[in-house]
Amino acid sequence: MIARCFSAVRGLHRVGGSRILFKMTLGREVMSPLQAVSSYTAAGRNVLRWDLSPEQIKTRTEELIAQTKQVYDSVGMLDIKDVTYENCLQALADVEVKYIVERTMLDFPQHVSTDREVRAASTEADKRLSRFDIEMSMREDIFQRIVHLQETCDLEKIKPEARRYLEKSVKMGRRNGLHLPEEVQNEIKSMKKRMSELCIDFNKNLNEDDTFLVFSKAELGALPDDFIDSLEKMDDDKYKITLKYPHYFPVMKKCCIPETRRRMEMAFNTRCKEENTVILQQLLPLRAQVAKLLGYSTHADFVLEMNTAKSTSRVTAFLDDLSQKLKPLGEAEREFILSLKKKECEEKGFEYDGKINAWDLHYYMTQTEELKYSIDQEFIKEYFPIEVVTEGLLNIYQELLGLSFEQVADAHVWNPSVTLYTVKDKATGEVLGQFYLDLYPREGKYNHAACFGLQPGCLLPDGSRMLSVAALVVNFSQPVAGRPSLLRHDEVRTYFHEFGHVMHQICAQTDFARFSGTNVETDFVEVPSQMLENWVWDIDSLRRLSKHYKDGNPIADDLLEKLVASRLVNTGLLTLRQIVLSKVDQSLHTNSSLDAASEYARYCTDILGVAATPGTNMPATFGHLAGGYDGQYYGYLWSEVFSMDMFYSCFKKEGIMNPEVGMKYRNLILRPGGSLDGMDMLQNFLQREPNQKAFLMSRGLQAP
């Protein structure tokens, strides 16, 4: 997931729908109010601070708003006949950079700080700045000057990226309703502010959720001793199990006690049920109302206009077609799982109810993998200690993309467990950026996996380049005494995926902050990172990523072959679940009056063939709905069509560690950032139109 943390260019990872894009940008000629605080925008430096107190966050938020508004006012007061590219558009773009960097220091701590008061202050800063973003994005005086510039400027005399910036600025102004009557603009503005606050609160509720359950050792049947030993023991000799991933998934995949899994699944899918259900009931109609005022039939139509899919009809056709193609495979997988369940119930004396429950799915899919491919993830993870995986991952990315990474000693970070690396071009030694690795769970920390863009890699007013900075935030299991953090293979895949976003952020070299890094279409943003997941299914790459944590021995070749062969296990059900989530997202954003829990339950039954547990409301836990993927969750599957096409037609064909192909990928897919349309970048790389053949093969299906 890409957490879109640039206020001016983002939407999240991230938390994105909670961010309102900074649509209009700020300016050069009125830089004087900002000079005193702009030293950190010097080229080639990471100027981010993570030690701000709650009071400093509040004070700096108000200062940033005052300084930025002064710039807007200056641009807005330009006589319309005196507007030029330099004093209007370029000026706005220059000041935008300063705003982004300062805003990052104010609103990112809500996701990673160990101090609850800092997180609260950061959340409030995010709300305050999001309201301000909306105010500034709806300045009709700025919009009028940009429209005038487009009408009078000699577009042939400005660079293509600047021309794109101008066109996007006008487009965003219209999508904000600045061409509409003032009373309509005010109505839109008011609703947008409320939507922003609701999105921030939705994700804050999930981040701050500290629900836990207590089980006896007997109730944790079949879970490995190392997992049990890592748990906090309660006074009554029972164990504390949280709903964080490092606890939840091991229980759901390996615990043989159905009642334990039922309780966990019920708790997991009722997190923040009351408060987030209320938020969705307010948020979805507001989105629909804004879309209607702007002239769109639905919110989904509004957001899809800017994506590669373009229309809800194309998305619906894609999802329905894929669902039908996967239906026979899903049925076969369900039948096999039911046979496993029936056999186990008979052997262990459990009641057999003749159906697959939501709390059965992960458990029996894990058994399927073990039986069909002799893959035991608990055994395999002993070969994936996090230090070995990290070293192997960094080496593969360096070799593939022509880069070098150096860990920064005594780095300024937000937690002692966080590390910082500098990225250089291997051939020239040019510093391209830096990235943080934040790998372990903490109280109040963002509880999924995402890449946060923190500092844009773009040009500064003096023509020098700002250092691009990103943070990879995940939640792998903590090391315990005598045993390092060990990753399941699916966690290794997640690591590769999110680091792919990091490389996109670092390797992009754009003129404007708005186009930096991962600021591409939402249904294209996953393409680069998904493509790089293929490396964790390659035997040679897996050898570089693994070593037994005790004796350093490699994984046996026959086990590696089985692991790679297991790629297609459960692919029908896993993909159908993605279709369920995509359909729910589309439904809620085409008919806002629908009940989210009921809609999810309907699609679970109709498409997945596994009923949602009564009393749960999974959409209330679905951060993407309030995190920049609203109406766009289909993008994960849509992007895979492109990512698989790139991998099989180029890397698989010419060698996955072929440095020439790697540089072609870096230059044609990563380097442009959002300065080109995603489909144009893809066609430049493929030298043809993309097709679904490789994607269908990756799902165990035959291309037509």
UniProtKB/Swiss-Prot annotation:
Q: Which UniProt keywords apply?
A: Acetylation, Cytoplasm, Hydrolase, Metal-binding, Metalloprotease, Mitochondrion, Protease, Transit peptide, Zinc
**What does it catalyze?**
Preferential cleavage in neurotensin: 10-Pro-|-Tyr-11
Active site as annotated: 498
Similarity comment: Belongs to the peptidase M3 family.
What is the free-text note on the cofactor? Answer: Binds 1 zinc ion per subunit.
Which cofactor(s) are needed, names only?
A: Zn(2+)
Localization of this protein: Mitochondrion intermembrane space; Cytoplasm, Cytosol
Pfam families per the UniProt record, alphabetical: Peptidase_M3
What is the protein named? Neurolysin, mitochondrial
